[in-house]
Every structure is written in structure tokens, then in C-alpha cells.
């Protein structure tokens, strides 16, 4: 009799998932947790009847968790707050997560630790296998103890004129979801300064209001936005190979602010030019909510072409004075400057091979005299930029750390190199890691960079499912990118997926 009733229920399409056998796969989490155990045959459901215990000294943790549940799942569970440090959670960003059929426990020593626990819970949960439309979510019973190996876990995004505000927000949300705690956002002529509007494109999307909104959103999600403005080279606000100059192409009256040979450098002998830079930095730092860091670029600068700049010998005196002025200005505002490393190393010096050195002999001396509260961002791109994924040593990182600087290793799009550099940052006790993305913000490469960098900065290797899955559409990044799209209410086809379109016009015309 029982067997016939069961068959009737199945035939009628109302077979209840709770009565079925289940065999959950290992939860696929980015970044991979340090300790994770789970029971493949024990489902835990997320529904309005569940009991959720939040252990955290910060009383606002319960309200944040309740709000996220409402946004993600459409219901608010019963939440019990225990206002004490979470047993097993280490440091400010560590967390614990326990899921059982009768209750789920999220714990952290800070609100951000609780946020990380909830992000992990969401990544572990899957839709229930019943019905034609979504009925709910479930996950295997599990226990997780997790803590990051690096304090500074950053990712560097560029906001090009071709990027939409929606896409940039999508990236910022993803960074928080992957437990990066800093996002450096470099404006490529898109910050609409109210004091100096000619330094941006017409209808620039990154207004002061938008900067404030994104900074507040990022903070709520657990990540700090750090603005970047290039105060030395890269003054064009565009890639050199594109031949564009954000200001001079449209506003030739501002030529005195830039070097005459292409306008790549700011004219550092012109006090009006350096004043404009400082005013712009001040405005941008304020717009982003006065974060604790500000990135000033300072990479890949040209030799001076301006006759008054060339008359100053050595030219490095102008450069150092300019950097110090901006550093002092931001220090007074409670912030430390970050800068790329390459102009602080003499090009051609064999000690630095295969790493990058673009400075003159005199500019290289600045490394010994600049204040040690500057954060050095040492970029090295492995086998995709004239180097190797696994160099025998990291002489430049060791050099700057030995001089007393807080030093970040900054990989790019070499997955093996990302892993190795993250490991070295942990073993050498560096300040942290800053993953760079540049123009590779779409497709499989972007997915690989983000997953790999999140793991490397956190300090755990990805599980076998993620290493061996050949399909980008099946990898966790695809699901996570889509989840964030749901959170944002994205419905525009061009804003979904990894590319703006499925195929390009030239493919369709073949």
C-alpha cells in the first residue's frame, strides 16, 4: 500500500523533496574555506520557519542578516542574536558557519565576519529539486571554520568610458561576495569633478553623487572603495595605444597643464598644474567618503619634454616634491597614499630582472627617501608580460619590504602566477595582495582571474570540482555573477553574462 501511494505521488508530480534521497555535492565556495565538512545526505532548508542564530558582538549584525535574507530569498527568518565573540572565529574577518535541519548558526567577531559567513551560506545553497518554478533553497548540513591569511585583499578595477555604471556596480558587488575587503577604482576620465570638469568626458557617469552611493553600497557589503587618480604619468586618462587624451582632445586651452610630448605626464614645473592635481585629489577623496587609502598611480611616466621641467636637474626633485605634497595633503585627511612601484627602480638594473623597472637613476633614489607610510603596489604579471609564473625569488618585493614599506604584490591574468604571488605574500609577511584586472573584465579570463585571486588572497586552494570543471558556464563564477544580477534587478540583455553580446556582428555576417 505504501509503495502504491508513493508511486501515485510521483506520477502526480507532487513528490516532496524532503522524502527523497539526496546526495549533495561538496559545496563550491569562492574563496575556498580553510575548514569545511558536510553531510551529503542531510538537507537543510532555507525557509521562513528556520531558526537562525547570529553570534557577534556587534548588535547590528542581526538586522543586516535579516535584510539580506529579505532581499535574497523574499522572507525573514527567526533571528536570535548572541552578543559575544564567536567561538572558533579568528580575527576581524574570520567566521564560523554551522547548518543543521533545526538551526543555522552564523558567527563572527565583527559585522564583516558575519557578512562573510552569510555570503558562504548563500553560495552553498542550491534551488530545491521540485516543481516548475522555484519553491525554495536547500544545502547540505555542514560546518565551516574560516579565516583569511592576508589582511589586505584587494582588487583593482578600471572604470573606462565604455563601461556602464551598472557593470561597475556588478564588479564591486562581486568583489565583496568573494571576500575582498578593498576595491581600488581607477577613473579613466569618468569622474565628473565639479571643480575641474574638463578632466572627464562629457556626461561622465562617476559623479560626486554616484561616488558617494557606490562607496556607501560597498561599505554595506563589507568592502572599502579606494579611488585612484594618476598624479604623474598616465595623465591622458586613456590607454597610450588608443591615442586619446581625455582633456586635450576637446579642451586644447588646458595644454599648459601637461607635458608637450603627447600630454602623457602632468607638467610638474607648472604650479598651476600641480595645484589642479591636488584640488582634484581632494575632491575625489571627499566624494568617496574619505577612505583610509588613495591610489596615486605614478607608473610608466615619460621623461620630461617640457623645457622648464627639463631645466630642473635632477627631474626627480620635481617628482618627489609633487608626490610628497599629495601625500601630506592626504595624510592630513587621514589617508595613506598607494603608488605603483616601477618608477622607484632604475630601468636596466639587472637586480630587478624579470621584474619591472621604469625609473631613472635619480628617481630610483626616491625609494630611500619617501615616507614609509606609503603603500607600494609592486605589479608583476608573470608569463603574460615577459616574465615567468614562478620566479626564483621576488627581489623587488623583498627590496621594498626591507626598506620598511607596506608592500602589496599585484598580479594580473596569469592564473599560476596569481597563486604563486599570493603564496609568497603570505609566506613573506607582505601587507597583502592587489589583483589587477585592467581591460580583461569580460569572459572566461575575467572569471578565472577573480576566482583564482580570491583564493590566493584568502589563503586556501580551490577544491577539485573547481579545478577540473572545463565549462565556464558551469563554474561557480557564472552562478555568482548571475546572483548579483538578481540583486541588482538587471534585465538588460547586454548587462547579463560575461559579454555584452553572444556573438559579434562580424560573426553574424560570415
Residue ranges and their predicted role:
Residues 8-18:
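Hydrophobic h-region of N-terminal signal peptides that target proteins for export
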Residues 1-4:
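Positively charged n-region of N-terminal signal peptides that target proteins for export
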Residues 74-88, 132-135, 184-191, 410-414, ...:
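A generic structural motif
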Residues 29-32, 36-39, 46, 54-55, ...:
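Substrate-binding groove of N-acetylhexosamine-processing glycoside hydrolases
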Residues 55, 82, 228-230, 299, ...:
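Short loop/turn motifs enriched for small/polar and acidic residues
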Residues 60-61, 162-164, 175, 190-194, ...:
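Flexible loop/turn segments at secondary-structure boundaries
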Residues 19-145, 354, 361-362, 379:
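Acidic, contiguous N-terminal accessory segments
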Residues 97-338:
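Feature activates predominantly on carbohydrate-active enzymes
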Amino acid at each position: 500500500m505504501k509503495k502504491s501511494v508513493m508511486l501515485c505521488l510521483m506520477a502526480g508530480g507532487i513528490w516532496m523533496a524532503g522524502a527523497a534521497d539526496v546526495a549533495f555535492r561538496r559545496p563550491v565556495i569562492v574563496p575556498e574555506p580553510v575548514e569545511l565538512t558536510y553531510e551529503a545526505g542531510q538537507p537543510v532548508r532555507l525557509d521562513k520557519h528556520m531558526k537562525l542564530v547570529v553570534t557577534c558582538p556587534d548588535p547590528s549584525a542581526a538586522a543586516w542578516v535579516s535584510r539580506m535574507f529579505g532581499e535574497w530569498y523574499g522572507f525573514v527568518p527567526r533571528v536570535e542574536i548572541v552578543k559575544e565573540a564567536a567561538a572558533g572565529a579568528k580575527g576581524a574577518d574570520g567566521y564560523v558557519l554551522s547548518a543543521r535541519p533545526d538551526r543555522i548558526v552564523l558567527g563572527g567577531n565583527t559585522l564583516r565576519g558575519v557578512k562573510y559567513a552569510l555570503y558562504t551560506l548563500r553560495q552553498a545553497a542550491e534551488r530545491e529539486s521540485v516543481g516548475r518554478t522555484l519553491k525554495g533553497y536547500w544545502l547540505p548540513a555542514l560546518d565551516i571554520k574560516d579565516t583569511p591569511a592576508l589582511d589586505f585583499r584587494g582588487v583593482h578595477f578600471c572604470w573606462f568610458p565604455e563601461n556602464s555604471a551598472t557593470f561597475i556596480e556588478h564588479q564591486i558587488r562581486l568583489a565583496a561576495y568573494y571576500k575582498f575587503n578593498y576595491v581600488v577604482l581607477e577613473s579613466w576620465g569618468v569622474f565628473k569633478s565639479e571643480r575641474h570638469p574638463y578632466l572627464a568626458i562629457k556626461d561622465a557617469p562617476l559623479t560626486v553623487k554616484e561616488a558617494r552611493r557606490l562607496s556607501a553600497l560597498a561599505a554595506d557589503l563589507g568592502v572599502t572603495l579606494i579611488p585612484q587618480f594618476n598624479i604623474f604619468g598616465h595623465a591622458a586618462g586613456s590607454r597610450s595605444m588608443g591615442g586619446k587624451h581625455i582633456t586635450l582632445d576637446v579642451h586644447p586651452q588646458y595644454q599648459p597643464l601637461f607635458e608637450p610630448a603627447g600630454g602623457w605626464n602632468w607638467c610638474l614645473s607648472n604650479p598651476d598644474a600641480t595645484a589642479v592635481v591636488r584640488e582634484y585629489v581632494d575632491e575625489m577623496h571627499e566624494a568617496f567618503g574619505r577612505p583610509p587609502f588613495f591610489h596615486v598611480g605614478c607608473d610608466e611616466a615619460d621623461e620630461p619634454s617640457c623645457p622648464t621641467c627639463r631645466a630642473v636637474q635632477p627631474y626627480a626633485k620635481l617628482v618627489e616634491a609633487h608626490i610628497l605634497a599629495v601625500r601630506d595633503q592626504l595624510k592630513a585627511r587621514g589617508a595613506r597614499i598607494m603608488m605603483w612601484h616601477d618608477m622607484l627602480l632604475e630601468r636596466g638594473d639587472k637586480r630587478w630582472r624579470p621584474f619591472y623597472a621604469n625609473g631613472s637613476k635619480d628617481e630610483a633614489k626616491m625609494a630611500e627617501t619617501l615616507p614609509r607610510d606609503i603603500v607600494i603596489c609592486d605589479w608583476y604579471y608573470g608569463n603574460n608580460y615577459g616574465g615567468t609564473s614562478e620566479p626564483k625569488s621576488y627581489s623587488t618585493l623583498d627590496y621594498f619590504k626591507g626598506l620598511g614599506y607596506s608592500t602589496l604584490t599585484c598580479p594580473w591574468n596569469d592564473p599560476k602566477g596569481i597563486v604563486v604571488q599570493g603564496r609568497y605574500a603570505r609566506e613573506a609577511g607582505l601587507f597583502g595582495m592587489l589583483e589587477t584586472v585592467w581591460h580583461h573584465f569580460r569572459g572566461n579570463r575575467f572569471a578565472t582571474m577573480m576566482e583564482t585571486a580570491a583564493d590566493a588572497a584568502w589563503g586556501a586552494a580551490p577544491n577539485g570540482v573547481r579545478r577540473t570543471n572545463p565549462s565556464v558556464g558551469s563554474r561557480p563564477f557564472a552562478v555568482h555573477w548571475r546572483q548579483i544580477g538578481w540583486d541588482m534587478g538587471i534585465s538588460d540583455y547586454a548587462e547579463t553574462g560575461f559579454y555584452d553580446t553572444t556573438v559579434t556582428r562580424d560573426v553574424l555576417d560570415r
